[in-house]
């Protein structure tokens, strides 16, 4: 007797009938909770920036720009009206550019040395690179102050610049070294197979490939230098940078021009990001 091997036909599915499984907690979290939490995080991040931009068009009655009074563009047309603000802003921009140049030049050389060469103390060098990033700014600022006082350095622009280059250097080294480590060595080998010497290979192959990492490290170093307050406060003496001016203004009254500068900084950063996205898309299409 043979067993019946025939199977019963599957039940027909009506047109329009859903074949998806019923929703559960996991599906609800994926479709509802995660987007809600993501929206709240974005709101938490960008709401202060929105408030800064809105209050840059405010005309406060008193010294503090904390309550909306009326719409005005006076702060935008008279940016340098508060005494000393534009001087502090100009000094911070100059220090940011100089600190970026110093940190990028030194950091790029250090990154190539650590990434491309094997030498005694290489592991210790990697550890030393990360130490300024892991050191609290209060500790770094006080240590630099002790060093400058011991060497009888007059605190001012020079000491601020040395301090900024020192703590920006680590971020540059880490960023550029990661870019160098991700390069394909076969590209340089192919250039040398085509009779290119080491200098030509570096400037025609290696440097263009590392350049995006150098640009990113430059932007990061400039942002860190321009925005720094703690280390600068320890080593500035009587010199006033823009973050120090903002801190002092918060004690005696915040003019709306500070909000204007913050709005301009956000718009410039946004423009840089948009330009980078456009360039990246064009390169991807090419």
Give the role of each language-model region:
Residues 4, 25-30, 61-64, 73-84, ...:
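Interhelical loop and adjacent transmembrane-helix boundary motif
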Residues 36-37, 42-49, 173-177, 183-185, ...:
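Transmembrane alpha-helices
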Residues 20-24, 64-67, 73, 122, ...:
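Membrane-interfacial helix termini and adjacent extracytoplasmic/periplasmic loops
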Residues 49-61, 141-152, 219-224, 232, ...:
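A structural signal for multi-pass alpha-helical bundles of membrane permease subunits
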Residues 1-90, 94, 275, 280-286:
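N-terminal, non-cleaved signal-anchor transmembrane helix
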Residues 43, 90, 94-106, 110, ...:
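Hydrophobic alpha-helical transmembrane segments of multipass integral membrane proteins
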Residues 2-16, 22-25, 33-36, 121, ...:
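C-terminal transmembrane helix and the adjacent membrane-cytosol boundary/short C-terminal tail
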Residues 22-27, 97-129, 142, 146, ...:
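Transmembrane-helix boundary motif in ABC transporter permease subunits
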């Amino acid at each position: 007797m043979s067993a019946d091997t025939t199977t019963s036909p599957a039940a027909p599915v009506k047109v329009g009938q859903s074949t998806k499984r019923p929703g559960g907690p996991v599906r609800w979290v994926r479709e509802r909770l995660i987007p809600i939490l993501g929206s709240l995080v974005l709101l938490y991040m960008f709401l202060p920036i929105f408030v800064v931009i809105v209050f840059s068009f405010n005309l406060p009655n008193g010294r503090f720009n904390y309550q909306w009074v009326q719409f005005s563009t006076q702060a935008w047309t008279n940016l340098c009206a508060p005494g000393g603000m534009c001087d502090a802003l100009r000094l911070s921009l100059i220090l940011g550019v100089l600190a970026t140049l110093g940190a990028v030049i030194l950091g790029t050389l250090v990154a190539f040395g650590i990434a491309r060469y094997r030498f005694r103390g290489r592991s210790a060098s990697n550890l030393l690179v990360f130490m300024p990033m892991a050191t609290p700014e209060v500790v770094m600022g006080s240590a630099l102050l002790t060093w400058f006082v011991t060497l009888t350095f007059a605190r001012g622009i020079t000491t601020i610049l040395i301090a900024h280059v020192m703590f920006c250097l680590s971020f540059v080294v880490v960023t550029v070294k990661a870019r160098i480590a991700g390069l394909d060595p076969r590209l340089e080998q192919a250039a040398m197979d085509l009779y290119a010497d080491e200098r030509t290979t570096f400037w025609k192959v290696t440097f263009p490939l590392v350049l995006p990492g150098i640009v990113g490290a430059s932007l990061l170093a400039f942002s860190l230098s321009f925005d720094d307050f703690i280390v600068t406060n320890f080593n500035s003496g009587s010199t006033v940078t823009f973050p120090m001016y903002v801190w002092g203004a918060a004690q005696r009254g915040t003019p709306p021009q500070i909000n204007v500068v913050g709005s301009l900084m956000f718009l410039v950063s946004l423009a840089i990001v948009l330009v980078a996205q456009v360039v990246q898309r064009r390169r991807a299409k090419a």
